[in-house]
Amino acid sequence: YFSLMPIIIGIFAVLAGSGLLASDEENGRLDLIAAQPISRSGLFVGRVLAFLTAMALILLAAWFLGLVVPATLFDFPATWLEMLRPFASLFAFLFLFGGLALLLGMILPSRRMAASLAGGLLILSYFVTGLGEIVEDMAVAADFSPYTYFQSGDAMAGLNWTWVAGLLAVGAVFVLLAWWRFLRRDIRVAGEGGWSLRLRRRQPAA
């Protein structure tokens, strides 16, 4: 039940994270929203809180429909709270990649590019962790893979809160960097950005 859930819901988290601000910017709405009597920080925090709320509701629905309901129909040894533990780990995992997608959306020229890169890293993390379990040479690389620290059904017996805190901390760093970047970047009127750099013009010789 939990093996592919980080990938399936993770794709949604990446798409949502990359589009929290970049989507409205490319559609020409963000400059109109920013013109309202609300600070950039307030807009940013509101979008992030909405994203986290949506993710929490999705995971609660998956917990209730996927585990709680079947547990009431069949004899399942775990309690409802124990069945909720893997979703706490999954929330931290999704927060990390959602924050990464948000940061990339503030750096890269387009939301599509940000979502593609974050999604690629998500899938790469899955394969690196899997290979690290069977290929000895990949074990070191797997230590740097976020998927390694996702706790699936084993978390019902006990959750490693250090791993959860680590995923949340890395995700928080990504979100803070995205906030810092959003405060200092120019908002495009519409369309995708580019890679062009503004160079200082050489002053004519006297």
Task: Label each residue range with its predicted role.
Residues 1-9, 88-95, 155-172:
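Hydrophobic alpha-helical transmembrane segments
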Residues 1-23, 119:
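Long, hydrophobic alpha-helical segments
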Residues 10-17, 65, 99-100, 146, ...:
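Hydrophobic/aromatic residues in alpha-helical transmembrane segments
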Residues 11-14, 50, 54, 81-86, ...:
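Short alpha-helical transmembrane interface motifs in multi-pass membrane proteins
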Residues 13, 61, 96, 173-174:
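Residue-level signal for transmembrane alpha-helical positions in Major Facilitator Superfamily
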Residues 21-52:
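Helix-loop-helix units of permease transmembrane domains in multi-pass membrane transporters
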Residues 45-106:
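Secretory targeting signals
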Residues 114-199:
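Terminal transmembrane helical anchor/hairpin motif
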